[in-house]
């Protein structure tokens, strides 16, 4: 059995998401609104008929071969036949290996050998099967070669013509011959074959500027080129040419047997030869004109040769009436009319186009064609006539499906035909099936089973993947999850296997996340993934495994067989050009691109967009853009104020293009608030509270200044605390034997008038609360001090343990304290000139006279040792 090397495209037509692929050519513009576009210079990719079978004419008993070639190797070829003897009958598939038909296949070429018989005459079609997809060729006619005479084999009397020299003679010797195919002609004079002056005279002997040497007996013979049958016409012409001097003057006129007018039918593109009959004496001159065709004579394709007008590469616009005027100065002038018909084979200028259609929707497809005669339009749905479909209606050039059903999914072809041939174009019709809910039990009372709670949500599988070739070793898969209310999907896994015996499914390592639980279209949510490390020239199947939130999984249906062709066997796809990356928002950008030629749209099914942050060297994110007409696409969500790099490639059902050049773009920065906060008017002061965005968007220099100032303030505070602590530690420990209360009293001395101006006097007090546990000991110390009140106070010399520097420091502190007290005492006249307050008793402290106003307390330096005993009491609080 032949290996099914290319069951491609092979898309699951009921659920896959694809674009239309034409069989022959497709209009580059959208069919619904475009003017008649020019046809592309090369055929479109995908499934198409490269070479359709050609019509043949053959004699009975001959064997002919019909050939059909497709762009890709199908799973199988079939041929259908409609006999010419059964009018109105449909096509029937031929059984191969029979006596009258033998089918052979070699790769993507199929050959049908037919023995020409009466029952094998008729129309033939080639049908290629690509999985569920059926592509049908145009019709080839097999006709029987034949040659006959319209008037029978009756003998005609020879014509006798006598003309003066210098005239041109036209004899239509083969006007009664009917031949299929057109006969080839041979001309004879006096039994000797002569070469015609013009090619394409089609059974007309034309002699220009005759002389006496042209006299003789003329005859002609028709030969059927297919069968080789020859017909010797019985009629002949006896021509006698007389010298011009002997002829009398005579106006232009027609000879016996020459037609009064002519009607010629010619195929577009052929050469047309118009001959003007008539003679006169003297020989007339000929002038050509046409009331219907502007510039019919004076153009580059027309040439006047004597009495003949030759038009090369005939066009439809050349059809009309041509008049040749013959004038030799003798009235009347002879006018000869020739009616020209130019026929044109059918050509579809607006092919059908179908998008993904929901089951049950109404679909209207248009197919417009040109041709002369006006072509007839008919439709095939997966190889079956639309006339047999109850949902189909034909209206002028439209096919209307009132309700699209699943059986309509596949290839829809439009055919235009006239007697010159056929032309076809098609589109892929994809049907999105309705979601079928599980039927609920009806009738009776539903009793819940034990351990049965509320109805669980279903697991809706993804659609079968659509496969596109990326390279010789990789493909791109596209699938979607239809809208549903079932269990949410967490991730996808891709599985594939090579077609063949004992080939197991392989699972890729990548986990494809479902993303945000929202639908990105009315139909559902689309996904893409690539599969690498494949082998070219092998056939694969793919499927998608969905993992749900309940940790269960469900598989999609498998894709149709996909044959991975090497890139050398495919035509290159047009590469899109990225024009601009538009900053759409803080989380989105819009890509804008173009094609080198809009005529390339018919080659494209859609586009793949790849993007990643410019600072990243990881894999690209992918987005699929459906439709060949797209020129922009929004990509979201993205990071705010982030630079990304983008690239594009176009794809069809068979392959993908090269990547476009990389282009960078970024998302927008966060927008600052333009709303002012309410202000409180206080005179001319501006007390407007800055908004959050204004504070957040503070300039870096200002932020650095504020931060540096805060650090300096903290350093200053820390330094002051350290200095104060060191001074406090130095001042404690002057007298180790002095009680704590007495020490505090000695530390504060009265200064009568510290300030020279006494505008405001305040009484200040130091309130000391002692520990109750040390109250008795403190009272004993106070009584002891009271007994020593009358004794003179002597300053004890300072004693230091080991450091003489401490002694010098204490002496300096004492001298500074003395100078301070002297200045304070000098300002008070009641001190009797004694500024040395060191002789005061300890009882003169502020604790003894707390109510006396106008007193200022200053701390006195202690000269005792730094070690002090605080076990006698603890200081709880100090009040000023």
Swiss-Prot record:
BP GO annotations: axon guidance; compound eye development; cuticle pattern formation; homotypic cell-cell adhesion; maintenance of protein location in extracellular region; segment specification; smoothened signaling pathway; wing disc anterior/posterior pattern formation
Glycosylation sites: 102, 209, 466, 557, 693
Residues that span the membrane, as ranges: 704-724
Keyword field: Disulfide bond, Glycoprotein, Heparin-binding, Immunoglobulin domain, Membrane, Proteoglycan, Repeat, Signal, Transmembrane, Transmembrane helix
Superkingdom of origin: Eukaryota
Organism: Drosophila yakuba (Fruit fly)
Residues covered by the Ig-like C2-type domain: 45-142, 132-234, 252-340, 346-432
Record family assignment: Belongs to the immunoglobulin superfamily. IHOG family.
Phenotype upon changing residue 863 to V: In strain: Tai18
Entry-linked InterPro entries: FN3_dom, FN3_sf, Ig-like_dom, Ig-like_dom_sf, Ig-like_fold, Ig_sub, Ig_sub2
Positions with biased composition (Low complexity): 823-837, 864-880
Outcome following mutation: residue 175 to Q: In strain: Tai18
UniProt domain comment: The first fibronectin type-III domain mediates a specific interaction with Hh protein, in vitro. The second fibronectin type-III domain is additionally required for in vivo signaling activity.
Name of this protein: Interference hedgehog
Domain annotation Fibronectin type-III: ranges: 461-567, 575-670
Assembly information from the UniProt record: Homodimer. Heterotetramer; 2 iHog chains bind 2 hh chains when facilitated by heparin, heparin is required to promote high-affinity interactions between hh and iHog.
């Amino acid at each position: 059995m032949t290996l099914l090397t290319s069951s491609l495209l092979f898309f699951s037509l009921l659920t896959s998401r694809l674009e239309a692929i034409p069989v022959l050519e497709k209009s580059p513009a959208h069919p619904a609104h475009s003017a008649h576009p020019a046809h592309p210079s090369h055929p479109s990719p995908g499934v198409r008929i490269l070479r359709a079978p050609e019509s043949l004419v053959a004699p009975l008993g001959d064997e002919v071969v019909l050939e059909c070639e497709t762009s890709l190797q199908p799973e199988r070829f079939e041929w259908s036949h409609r006999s010419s003897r059964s009018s109105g009958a449909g096509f029937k598939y031929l059984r191969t290996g029979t006596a009258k038909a033998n089918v052979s296949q070699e790769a993507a070429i199929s050959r049908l050998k037919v023995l020409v018989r009466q029952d094998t005459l008729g129309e033939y079609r080639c049908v290629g099967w690509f999985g569920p997809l059926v592509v049908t060729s145009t019709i080839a006619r097999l006709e029987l070669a034949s040659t006959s005479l319209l008037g029978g084999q009756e003998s005609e009397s020879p014509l006798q013509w006598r003309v003066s020299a210098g005239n041109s003679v036209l004899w239509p010797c083969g006007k009664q011959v009917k031949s299929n195919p057109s006969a080839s002609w041979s001309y004879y004079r006096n039994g000797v074959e002569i070469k015609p002056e013009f090619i394409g005279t089609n059974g007309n002997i034309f002699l220009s500027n005759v002389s006496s040497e042209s006299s003789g007996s003329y005859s002609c013979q028709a030969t059927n080129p297919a069968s080789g049958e020859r017909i010797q016409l019985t009629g002949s012409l006896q021509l006698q040419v007389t010298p011009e001097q002997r002829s009398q003057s005579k106006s232009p006129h027609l000879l016996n047997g020459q037609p009064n007018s002519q009607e010629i039918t010619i195929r577009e593109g052929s050469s047309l030869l118009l001959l003007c009959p008539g003679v006169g004496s003297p020989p007339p001159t000929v002038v050509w004109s046409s009331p219907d065709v502007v510039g019919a004579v004076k153009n580059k394709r027309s040439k006047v040769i004597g009495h003949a007008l030759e038009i090369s590469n005939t066009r439809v616009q050349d059809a009309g009436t041509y008049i040749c005027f013959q004038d030799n100065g003798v009235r009347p002038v002879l006018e000869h009319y020739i009616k020209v018909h130019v026929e044109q084979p059918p050509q579809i200028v607006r092919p059908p186009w179908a998008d993904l259609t929901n089951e049950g929707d109404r679909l209207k497809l248009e197919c417009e064609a040109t041709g002369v005669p006006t072509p007839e339009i008919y439709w095939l749905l997966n190889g079956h006539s639309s006339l047999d479909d109850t949902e189909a209606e034909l209206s002028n050039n439209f096919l209307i499906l009132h309700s699209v059903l699943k059986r309509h999914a596949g290839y829809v072809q439009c055919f235009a035909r006239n007697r010159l041939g056929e032309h076809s174009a098609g589109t892929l019709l994809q049907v999105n099936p309705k979601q079928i809910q599980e039927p609920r039990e009806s009738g009776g009372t539903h009793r819940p089973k034990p351990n049965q709670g509320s109805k669980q949500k279903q697991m809706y599988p993804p659609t079968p993947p659509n496969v596109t070739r990326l390279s010789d070793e990789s493909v791109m898969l596209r699938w979607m999850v239809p809208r549903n209310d079932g269990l949410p999907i967490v991730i996808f896994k891709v599985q594939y296997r090579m077609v063949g015996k004992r080939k197991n499914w392989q699972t890729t390592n990548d986990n494809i996340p479902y993303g945000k639980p929202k639908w990105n279209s009315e139909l559902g949510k689309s996904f893409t993934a690539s599969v690498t490390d494949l082998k070219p020239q092998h056939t694969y199947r793919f499927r998608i495994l969905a993992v749900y939130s309940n940790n269960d999984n469900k598989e999609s249906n498998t894709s149709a067989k996909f044959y991975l062709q090497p890139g050398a066997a495919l035509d290159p796809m047009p590469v899109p050009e990225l024009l601009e990356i538009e900053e759409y928002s803080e989380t989105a950008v819009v890509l804008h691109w173009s094609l080198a030629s809009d005529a390339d749209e018919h080659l494209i099914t859609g586009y793949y967009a790849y993007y990643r942050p410019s600072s990243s060297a990881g894999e690209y994110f992918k987005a699929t853009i459906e439709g060949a007409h797209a020129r922009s696409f929004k990509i979201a969500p993205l990071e705010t104020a982030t630079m990304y790099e983008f690239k594009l490639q176009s794809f069809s059902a068979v392959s993908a293009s090269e990547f476009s050049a990389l282009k960078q773009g970024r998302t927008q920065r966060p927008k600052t608030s333009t709303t002012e906060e309410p202000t409180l008017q206080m005179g001319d002061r501006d007390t407007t509270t800055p908004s959050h965005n204004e504070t957040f968007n503070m300039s870096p220099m200002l932020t650095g200044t504020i931060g540096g100032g805060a650090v300096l303030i903290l350093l200053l505070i820390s330094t002051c605390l350290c200095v104060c602590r060191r001074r406090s530690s130095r001042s404690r420990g002057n007298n180790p034997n002095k009680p704590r209360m007495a020490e505090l009293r000695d530390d504060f001395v009265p200064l009568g008038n510290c300030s020279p101006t006494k505008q405001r006097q305040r009484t200040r007090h130091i309130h000391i609360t002692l520990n109750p546990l040390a109250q008795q000991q403190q009272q004993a110390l106070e009584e002891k001090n009271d007994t020593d009140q009358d004794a003179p106070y002597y300053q004890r010399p300072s004693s230091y343990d080991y450091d003489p520097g401490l002694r010098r420091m204490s002496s300096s502190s004492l001298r500074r304290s003395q100078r301070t007290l002297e200045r304070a005492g000098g300002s008070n006249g009641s001190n009797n000139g004694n500024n040395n307050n060191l002789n005061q008793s300890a009882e003169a402290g502020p604790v003894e006279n707390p109510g006396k106003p106008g007193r200022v307390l200053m701390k006195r330096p202690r000269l005792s040792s730094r070690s002090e005993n605080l076990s006698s009491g603890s200081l709880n609080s100090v009040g000023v």
